[in-house]
């Protein structure tokens, strides 16, 4: 169900709204500051609630089936209600006012996490327990210690633009993590984004590799046709 960008609905969503069988809901850009009406959406698996004025996440506390949760560009400070949402796989929390991410402790299925632009965020120690984390953005935060990510064998993308993490610590992290990957037989290069330029060139490289692959396959097929 997609009712995003319909600001006229802001004042017409009753707390007892029937959402019992809804599995996917997009309520982005409505201007919501109250999401009490979601508390009974017990089958909800995907919630996109970007660009609102949400502060209180308590109504989400019992939505145990949630797997995808987009809450970026709100006014969230406390993510405590997410503590028991053990099935989360994707969590977008960028551009909020979050300082404490300990409620993410032990999220075993969480693989994508965006915390960028939470400028007061300093401590990411809890992420050492998020064992399947593979993509993380902590750009534009006050994070200075990246060592909690050292032993995350599945991590392959980390964005750290405009943080307090030193170049030497990034180098140590890269070496340590690659050793961990090697020990676990994982052949996936770690990509660390430190500037907008590095992100651009990284994307450029991927596109280049894709084009080479396409041209190579096309060329081989052409050769086969000519030599049948």
Where are these regions (language model features)?
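Juxtamembrane/start-of-transmembrane alpha-helix segments at the extracytoplasmic/lumenal side
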Residues: 195-210
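Short amphipathic alpha-helix with an adjacent loop that forms part of the alpha/beta core around
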Residues: 14-16
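Concave beta-strand-loop units of leucine-rich repeat
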Residues: 1-9, 21-33, 43-55, 59, ...
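Core hydrophobic alpha-helical membrane-spanning segments
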Residues: 210-216
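C-terminal membrane-anchoring or membrane-association module
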Residues: 216-228
């Amino acid at each position: 169900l997609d009712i995003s960008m319909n600001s006229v609905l802001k004042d017409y969503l009753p707390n007892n709204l029937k959402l019992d069988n809804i599995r996917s809901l997009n309520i982005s850009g409505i201007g919501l500051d109250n999401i009490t009406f979601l508390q009974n959406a017990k089958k909800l698996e995907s919630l996109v609630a970007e660009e609102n004025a949400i502060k209180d996440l308590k109504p989400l506390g019992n939505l145990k089936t949630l797997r995808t949760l987009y809450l970026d560009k709100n006014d969230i400070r406390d993510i405590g209600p997410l503590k028991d949402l053990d099935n989360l796989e994707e969590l977008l929390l960028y551009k909020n006012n979050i300082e404490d991410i300990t409620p993410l402790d032990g999220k075993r299925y969480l693989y994508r996490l965006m915390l960028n632009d939470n400028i007061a965020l300093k401590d990411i120690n809890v992420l050492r327990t998020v064992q399947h984390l593979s993509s993380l953005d902590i750009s534009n935060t006050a994070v200075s210690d990246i060592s909690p990510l050292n032993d995350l064998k599945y991590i392959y993308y980390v964005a750290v633009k405009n943080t307090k993490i030193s170049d030497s610590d990034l180098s140590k992290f890269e070496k340590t993590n690659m050793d961990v990957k090697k020990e676990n037989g994982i052949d996936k290069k770690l990509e660390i984004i430190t500037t907008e330029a590095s992100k651009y060139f990284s994307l450029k490289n991927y596109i280049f590799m894709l084009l080479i692959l396409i041209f190579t396959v096309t060329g081989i097929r052409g050769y086969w046709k000519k030599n049948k």
